[in-house]
Design a protein with these regions (language model features):
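SF2 helicase motor core recognition
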Residues: 22, 27-29, 100-106, 120-121, ...
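Conserved helicase/translocase motor-coupling segment
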Residues: 208-300, 304
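Conserved P-loop NTPase motor "coupling/switch" region that bridges the ATPase
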Residues: 53-55, 110, 127-207, 361
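Conserved helix-turn-beta segment of the N-terminal RecA-like "Helicase ATP-binding" lobe
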Residues: 63-88, 158-161
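Conserved Walker A/P-loop ATP-binding site and its immediately adjacent core
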Residues: 31-34, 49-75, 146-150, 281-282
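Walker A/P-loop NTP-binding motif
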Residues: 12-18, 29-50
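A conserved SF2-helicase RecA2
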Residues: 344-353, 357-403
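Conserved pre-motif I regulatory segment
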Residues: 1-20
């Protein structure tokens, strides 16, 4: 298997406990398998060193597991979850993060943790730390961490800290008068920077694709919007908004259901025969269904309830809910993504955009359309431009005027 030059460079730097960092579509999967085959198992000429070979466990998204995406890359190394198709005599397991707890007692194997989920200190992170103590492993990520706290599980797994308590004692200062534990700042960050540099293996490469990003201004019902802002009022339920989350939800529904968005989508679908459309809320999906049915455009869906494939017709749209489908799959049959509404998370937006920007895409030019209205959408966009997550509480405290 011949790798691209940027993958070869990364392979030489990889080591046990590292995070392979590559943009979406950079080929992290094939590079991680090359590391397992060549460095961990002493593979050469499609043969493993019998004394070095280890069973392989891949923890990935449910979608990647169910679509058998990993199996395509495994074939280059004669690896397969099917024992009859894997001549090396090693066990190969591909499963989702939801089931990581099932493998806490596995020892002397090699784990690839795909689409990093070990952020925070929940059940998945605790299972990951337990597995890391008795196995070799690497992590794959396009966006490894936004804050130092995101790195706690990986730093513990590498033996730099005994537990979260030690990390907190050495590096975190909490806000004095907060109602709940709130981080005010981090200290001794020089040490953290050195440790992070020792585990990150960047996979940099120059993309041949040209990205064309267009931000389209949608309208809003001004009267409804101002009534909500001034009175913290939900016009859909005719009752007060109970908190920042509900108030922001109402504002977003006001702008996302504005008729101008229908007009914009119809125009874009007239210009592009095939497109992926990302959305946040179920009411947006209902609007998009209506548009496609009216225009007689075939469409498929991927959300919490439906897992339909991408259509194979000449003209189609694929309606994808961010949480369900921002990562773990790709499509090289279209050059267009439309973001019907913006997601709060920079990480999710980046992952979503990468569904069409792959190494093997046949398109030179890729088109991205972002729909946004004045007001709350502008604030979300500002947070995304700063590579941060939109904060509803901050927006609520700044913008809303209660009676």
């Amino acid at each position: 298997m011949e790798l691209y030059s940027h993958q070869e460079k990364a392979l030489k730097k990889m080591h046990n406990g590292c995070i392979l960092v590559g943009g979406v579509g950079s080929g992290k999967s094939i590079t991680s398998l090359a590391y397992y085959f060549n460095k961990v198992c002493g593979g050469k000429d499609k043969r493993m060193d019998p004394k070095k070979k280890r069973d392989l466990y891949i923890i990935t998204t449910a979608r990647k597991r169910d679509s058998h995406e990993w199996e395509g890359d495994m074939a280059h190394f004669l690896l397969s979850p099917d024992p009859t198709a894997s001549p090396h005599g090693v066990k190969v397991v591909v499963d989702s993060w939801n089931n990581i707890g099932k493998y806490e007692n596995v020892e002397n194997s090699f784990f690839i943790f795909d689409e990093q989920r070990v952020v925070g200190y929940g059940a998945w992170s605790k299972s990951f730390i337990k597995i890391s103590k008795v196995n070799q492993w690497i992590l794959l990520s396009a966006t490894p961490g936004d804050t130092w706290s995101d790195y706690i599980p990986v730093l513990i797994a590498n033996g730099f800290y005994k537990n979260k308590t030690q990390f907190t004692r050495e590096h975190i200062i909490f806000a004095r008068f907060a109602k709940y534990p709130k981080i005010d700042r981090y200290i001794n960050t020089d040490k953290l920077s050195r440790l992070r540099a020792s585990i990150l293996v960047p996979m940099k490469f120059e993309r041949e694709t040209i990205l064309h990003k267009t931000f389209i201004t949608a309208g809003r019902n001004e009267a409804m919007y101002q009534d909500c802002v001034r009175g913290i009022w939900d016009p859909f339920k005719n009752e007060p908004c109970v908190n920042a989350a509900s108030a922001c939800y109402v504002l977003r529904k006001i702008v996302n259901t504005d008729p101008t968005r229908r007009t914009i989508i119809r125009k874009l679908m007239a210009e592009h025969k095939r497109a992926i459309i990302f959305y946040n809320f179920t009411y947006e999906l209902e609007i998009l269904r209506d548009i496609m049915n009216e225009a007689q455009i075939e469409y498929g869906e991927w959300n919490g309830e439906k897992h339909q494939p991408v259509p194979k017709t000449d003209r189609w749209t694929y309606l994808v809910q961010y949480t369900a489908g921002a990562e773990g799959w790709n499509c090289i049959d279209t050059d267009t993504i439309i973001f019907y509404s913006l997601n709060y998370s920079y990480k999710i937006m980046t992952q979503a955009a990468g569904r069409i920007d792959r190494l093997n895409t046949p398109f030179k030019d890729l088109f991205y359309y972002y729909l946004a209205a004045p007001g709350i959408d502008q604030n979300i966009r500002r947070a995304l431009n700063n590579k941060k997550k939109f904060n509803e509480e901050d927006f609520y405290n700044e913008e809303f005027i209660p009676f």
